[in-house]
Amino acid sequence: MTTDTTGRTGKPAAAASPERFRYGFLKGNPQLTKNGELKHLLSIEGLPRSIVNHILDTAEQFVSVTDREVKKVPLLRGKSVFNLFFENSTRTRTTFEIAATRLSADVLNLNINASSTSKGESLLDTINNLSAMHADLFVVRHASSGAPYLIAEHCAPHVHVINAGDGRHAHPTQGLLDMYTIRHYKRDFTKLRVAIVGDILHSRVARSDIHALTTLGVPEVRAIGPRTLLPGGLEQMGVKVFHNLDEGLKGVDVIIMLRLQNERMSGALLPSAQEYFKTWGLTPERLALAAPDAIVMHPGPMNRGVEIDSQVADGPQSVILNQVTFGIAVRMAVMGIVAGNSD
């Protein structure tokens, strides 16, 4: 049993207008203080380019912490970070935990299956009780789009909220670590052609990446996939849509592959995984259509032989494992920035 964005227990709330690219609950910008500083990180949509660049610049300073003998800085000493994962996660939850620990915070991972929400307590009651325990920062993953917004709206004034993925809406720290990875290898966003390939309809990563890429001035963003897996509204965002993988990959500098999110699909949107790979899988032959120095990315988890060939995933143009490494520094930067901004 999960808790919907109204605080009631039951099935996850449906995303507002799921076939469209934008979501109805995004009113104003609750992420920013009155002074325009970042209090919560809920979505990349609506963030000024200056804040996105500030996060990336700060992350660059934290990358070197990994190479130190003592991999800690005292930035969040005395602060309490609560990881509230209402959806299963390994990679994201672990990197947030590592990032908070390296900032010297006290970290608590809430066991959702054993928590009061599984016994009928509302989401807001749970949040209020945790706030009373003097939590400073909530890292939230939830099946319902908008749940982190609800928490940010109702939590205690001193508490900060970071969205670690909500429904199919947004995954802002993944989008930011993807931007950091691209900047690390390509430097200048204003000269790039970036392709996002696969199940874009159900992907919160794709939404965050597209908002980040357009915010940072990428002149050409391509969405490539079958018609059944592309949302409406992409063209209005300035995204070029391709329904042929070979055509879409021609000359691109960055390829971001996405997995099929079968757990979010209703009905038969696709043939078998084998047939999908034949048409939409990234093989060495298809990679050769991109720019010679193109990089290949994937937010994980990765399904070899479905959306990507092992030769590509493990090849010299793949930067997938580096995304994971950079993710720790990016999440350190986000937590350090939001916890230092209060209104």
Swiss-Prot record:
Q: Which GO terms describe its cellular component?
A: cytosol
Can the keyword Transferase be found in this entry's annotation? yes
Q: In which pathway does it act?
A: Pyrimidine metabolism; UMP biosynthesis via de novo pathway; (S)-dihydroorotate from bicarbonate: step 2/3
Task: From the UniProt record, give one GO term of the biological process aspect.
Answer: 'de novo' UMP biosynthetic process
Q: Which reaction does it catalyse?
A: carbamoyl phosphate + L-aspartate = N-carbamoyl-L-aspartate + phosphate + H(+)
Which keywords does UniProt give here?
Pyrimidine biosynthesis, Transferase
SUPFAM superfamilies named among the record's database cross-references: Aspartate/ornithine carbamoyltransferase (SSF53671)
What's the short name of a Pfam family annotated to this entry? OTCace_N
Indicate the secretion signal residues. Answer: none
- What InterPro entries does the annotation carry? Asp/Orn_carbamoyltranf_P-bd (IPR006132), Asp/Orn_carbamoylTrfase (IPR006130), Asp/Orn_carbamoylTrfase_sf (IPR036901), Asp_carbamoyltransf (IPR002082), Asp_carbamoyltransf_Asp/Orn-bd (IPR006131)
What EC numbers are recorded for this enzyme?
A: 2.1.3.2
- Residues given in the record as L-aspartate binding sites: K119, R204, R259
**Residues bound to carbamoyl phosphate:** R91, T92, R141, H171, Q174, G300, P301
GO terms assigned for molecular function: amino acid binding; aspartate carbamoyltransferase activity
State the HAMAP family in the record.
Answer: Asp_carb_tr
Q: How does it assemble?
A: Heterododecamer (2C3:3R2) of six catalytic PyrB chains organized as two trimers (C3), and six regulatory PyrI chains organized as three dimers (R2).
User: Which protein family is it in?
Assistant: Belongs to the aspartate/ornithine carbamoyltransferase superfamily. ATCase family.
Q: Which NCBIfam families match?
A: asp_carb_tr, PRK00856.1
Function, as annotated, reads: Catalyzes the condensation of carbamoyl phosphate and aspartate to form carbamoyl aspartate and inorganic phosphate, the committed step in the de novo pyrimidine nucleotide biosynthesis pathway.
What protein name applies here? Aspartate carbamoyltransferase catalytic subunit
Gene encoding the protein: pyrB
